[in-house]
Amino acid sequence: MAKIFFYGAISLDGYLSDVNDGLQWLFDTEVGDKLTTDAFLDTVETVVMGRITYEEARKYVQPLYPGKDVVVFTHNTNFDVQEGFAVSEDPVDYLRKLKEQQSGNIWVVGGMNLLKNIIVADLIDEWWIQIAPVLLGNGKRLFEQSDYQTRLELIDITQMKQLTELHFRRPENKKDSPSL
């Protein structure tokens, strides 16, 4: 059975992107040569994202995740995905099936519309969150208000120059996890 991961960066005040879905603030952050991205990608078979995230990622990354299955969730059944394929069914149902059917891990890239439902459904097994020392003040938050109170375990902290990565996992046995 696959695991579902979130791996992504936020501003210090919790935003995934600015008000225009832009990520330039992240690309302007000095990270040095200790990036964890390549090692993380080696653990992933399928990359999942929403349409807006797909369009933004293609502006910065070409080719987009070579050697990985790329799934783009969109309500537009005519949306042309250059690398990967479009899916218009419910993301939570789709990911539950995919998690059971494949052995390779699944990376949920974003965006917020997709992530919110996946977080509420408690499908993410591990989190890698990079925090950039930038205050955006507005934009799309990683965590919106909702009903998803969950206790996680800290696995590791990695410093990449100006970026700090926190790696968490959901406890294997929720009965043994500390209460909130």
Q: What is the predicted function of each stretch?
A:
Residues M1-L180:
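Enzymes that bind and transform nitrogen-containing heteroaromatic metabolites
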